[in-house]
Amino acid sequence: DVERLEKLEKAGRLTLLDGDVEDLFPGISVYSVGFGHSFDLQMVMVDTEKGKFLHTGDACNRPENLLGTESFPFYLPNTDFAVGPALNIVRGFDRILELVHGDVTHLIMTHDDTRRDLFPWHKSELGLSIFEIC
């Protein structure tokens, strides 16, 4: 809740990010992507032994949003659940591809069911899918 966040900030235990932050922690960077599914989205880049992977969060949920489909091989932004104009989402998609130098195999999308074929994974006790990308 907002009151708790205010208390944490006053106590010096909360740092608010504004824009891109390279090496927030060693090997972890945060990138702002603007509007999309919600306001002022952020993505996290993690440097692993297998290279850098970008978790797109809600900036791009599914591969077909970014890559299109066989019938429609172009960006398919989901504007039904978006904030702001579709152009902002398309610009965000451009940024995503720029950050991974076009290598979509280094993207982790929140609702990407194809990850099961790419990374080892297991179900947690709570029924969550845990993927190992390192």
Predicted regions mapped to residue ranges:
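Metallo-beta-lactamase
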Residues: 1-33, 81-104
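Pocket-edge structural micro-motifs
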Residues: 18, 32-34, 57-58, 111
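Cap/insert and terminal regions of metallo-dependent hydrolase folds
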Residues: 49-134
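Active-site beta-strand termini and strand-to-loop segments that position acidic
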Residues: 35, 44-49
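Residue-level detector of solvent-exposed, low-hydrophobicity positions
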Residues: 12-15, 44, 118, 126-128
